[in-house]
């Protein structure tokens, strides 16, 4: 009688833990904006405008939603200081290519595998207990 009580409790615990699935969802959409970068040197500051990639992450912990936004400036080639001699270049005119940015959407999700396997383990334990009775 005592062993069947333990097996019943194990089966109930396995079913209850199956309800605690963990799901993670990721949504991506590329977005750019212009940012102003201020650089200071020797008490003299200068501002430059640069395109930047905008990233936003939303994190929910214990029903508290926190949103993080970052702006990552995209690299641009700046002229290097110093002297240089350019090699002669011969070129032919190539057709102009134009590109336009389009938003990219992707969604992925993951459900915790351990939460799915635990009820099966509880059922196996309950079945083994029933065989031993």
UniProtKB/Swiss-Prot annotation:
Domain of life: Eukaryota
Subcellular location: Secreted, Cell wall; Membrane
Extent of the signal sequence: 1-18
Post-translational modification: Extensively O-glycosylated; glycans consist probably of single mannose residues. N-glycosylated.
Compositional bias segments (type: Polar residues): 81-104
Residue positions the entry lists as glycosylated: 21, 23-24, 26, 28, 31-33, 36, 38-39, 46, 48, 81, 97
Keyword annotations of the record: Cell wall, Cell wall biogenesis/degradation, Glycoprotein, GPI-anchor, Isopeptide bond, Lipoprotein, Membrane, Repeat, Secreted, Signal, Ubl conjugation
Residues in Sequence repeats: 75-88, 91-103
Prodomain residues: 113-133
Annotated lipid attachment (GPI-anchor amidated glycine): 112
Disulfide bridge positions per record: none
GO biological process, one term: conjugation with cellular fusion
Membrane topology designation: Lipid-anchor; GPI-anchor
Extra remark: Present with 158000 molecules/cell in log phase SD medium.
Protein purpose: Component of the cell wall. May play a role in the formation of a tightly packed outer mannan layer, which protects the inner glucan.
Family: To yeast protein YDR134C.
Annotated protein name in UniProt: Covalently-linked cell wall protein 12
Gene assigned in the entry: CCW12
């Amino acid at each position: 009688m005592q062993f069947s009580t333990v097996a019943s409790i194990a089966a109930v615990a396995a079913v209850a833990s199956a309800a605690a699935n963990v799901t993670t969802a990721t949504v991506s959409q590329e977005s750019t904006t212009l940012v102003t970068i201020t650089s200071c040197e020797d008490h003299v500051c200068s501002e430059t405008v640069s395109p930047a990639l905008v990233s936003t992450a939303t994190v929910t912990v214990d029903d508290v939603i926190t949103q993080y936004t970052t702006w990552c400036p995209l690299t641009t080639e700046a002229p290097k200081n110093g002297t240089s001699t350019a090699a002669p270049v011969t070129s032919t005119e190539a057709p102009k290519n134009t590109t336009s940015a389009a938003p990219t959407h992707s969604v992925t999700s993951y459900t915790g595998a351990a939460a799915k396997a635990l009820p099966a383990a509880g059922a196996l334990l309950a079945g083994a207990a029933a065989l031993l009775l």
